[in-house]
C-alpha cells in the first residue's frame, strides 16, 4: 500500500518562471505574486515565492482583448491596483455588458446581455412569469435596471462611489497595451517580480522530462520549479517543446480572422458606450468598444465564408456610418488570423499554459481575459507545495479548464444557433445540426420546456452562469413553453413576481435619474479620482 501523504516531501515549489509578457503574462504574475508574497517579505520565516517573467524584446504582443468581465474588479483590488490609476493610465471606461445588433433577424433588432443578474435572481426565477407578457416588454427591461443604463450610455456608479464599488455591476473597456504596462510596473515595483528581457533560444529538460531551465540569448540559463507558458499562440513551452496537441473547434465556431482598427471620436465630448457593441454581418460580426479617447472597432469573420476584401468593405462601411466618412478613409486596419480551439491539456509536467498559449476563440463575450484570471487564480490557490503532488494539481486543473472551454463554446455557439438569419451560407451553416455541440443541443431542447436557472450551470464559479443564458435566449426571441402541471413553487412565484417586476421598474427610474453619463464620470475620475475603500 502506498501512502504518499507520509512520504518525505521532495522538491518544494519556490520559484516560478513565466515566459511571455503582455496582458496574460503580467496578469498571471500579479495574481500569483499577490497571493504568495513574492515581494521579499517572508511571513513567520517562511520562504517567499520567487517569480521571474522573461519577455522577448522582439515580439509584439497582440493583446488578448480590450474588454473584461466584472471579475477584473476583485482581481485588481487583490493585486493592490488603484481603480483611479486604471482609469487614468489605461484609457479605461466602464463596460456593463454587451449590446447585440442584428443578431436575431438582421433587420435592426437589438438586445443586451447585462452583467447584473435579473432582479432577485438568487431566490426567484422571473423568466416563467415574464413569458406571460413577453410580447409587451423585453426580458432584460423587465428583470434588470442595467438594460436602460446600457442603451443610454450611463455609468454604473457615481463619483462619490468608492473604488470597485458599484450601483450596477461592471467590467472595463481598456487599451490592452497600456493595461499590460500598468500591470508590469505594478508587478515589478510593488510585488517584487523579476523582469528579464531576453529571447528563449533553448529549453533544457531534466531526466524525468520536466523543464529544468531556459537558455536565453542575453540572460544565460534561468531555472525554476514551475514554468508558465504565456508566449501567445506560439505556445513555446506547451506546444513547441512538449508537443501537446491542439484541438481545433472550427467545426463549431467558424470565425478565424479578425480585422482590427482604432478610430478617433469625431468630437471630444462624443458619448462613451456603456457596453461592447456587437453588430452581426453577413459572415461574422463587428465589435465596437468605446474608450475615453478612441473607439476600438474590428470585424471578426470566417475566411471560409467571405474574403478579406469583402470583410474589410463591411468594416469600413460600418465606420463610415457610425463614426464618419472621414474616419473610414483614414482608418488603418490590422489583420489577425487565429485557429479557434485549445490545447488537449493545459498543465503538463511542470509547465502550465495561460492565455493564447492555452487556446483562443473569437472575442464574442470577452472570454480571453477572464480565462487568464481564472487560470492564474487556480494556479495561485492550488499551487503545489512540492513536485510530488504537482501531477495531482495538474489533473484537477486540466479537468476544470477542459470543462470551462466546453462551456464557453456552448455559450458562444448559442448566439448563432438562435439566430433566424438565413441571408448567407455563414448563417445557414451555423444553424446546421452538424455544427452544434451535442451538449448545447440537449440544453436547448431542455430549455424549450423549462427556463435556465441555477442547476443548469453545475459549478459555483461558472464563467457564464444561468443568468447569462437567460439574457441571450430571451433576447434572441427564444420561447420556453409554459408547464401544464401546477406546481406550488409556480404559485409562489406568481404571487411574488408582480412586486419584483415593480421593484425593478422603480429601481430603473431611480438609476436613470441618478447616474451620470459614462463620459461625465470618466472625466471626473480623471480630475478628482475615486475614494479608496
Which positions does each model-derived feature cover?
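N-terminal Rossmann-like FAD-binding beta1-loop-alpha1 element of flavoenzymes
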Residues: 14-46
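Low-complexity, highly charged intrinsically disordered N-terminal segments
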Residues: 110-182, 186-190, 230, 242-245, ...
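Predominantly flavin-linked oxidoreductase catalytic cores and closely associated redox partners
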Residues: 162-284, 289-298, 302-311, 376
